[in-house]
Amino acid sequence: MLNAKNRLRKRKEFGYIYKKGTKIYGQHLCIFFVPSKISAPKIGISVANKVGHAVVRNKLKRQIRHIMREFVPAIKNINLVIMIYPEIVGTTYENLKQNIQKTLQKGKIISE
């Protein structure tokens, strides 16, 4: 689970990142990010209603929060939103982790 200081919660924050942020496309996901004035990164997760039932969506969000917890120390001064596409349903945890890591590296959010 992400710490409270590392979570995006407000609709206004999500909207700002969608509007002003840079997009990075990965396999089955898209990451929007903007530079932040605060040193601690803030992370939001967006899973559309088209992605399975509520149980499936919540499981994906829990897995992504757990994965991002490992990457938080490497991320500096960035707020980001991870948007999940419906095709991701059925992928393994390890595959999801690799997809997120590759996408973060592609956008130079974390180093390789």
Predicted regions and their residues:
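Positively charged, solvent-exposed patches that mediate nucleic-acid binding
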Residues: 1-112
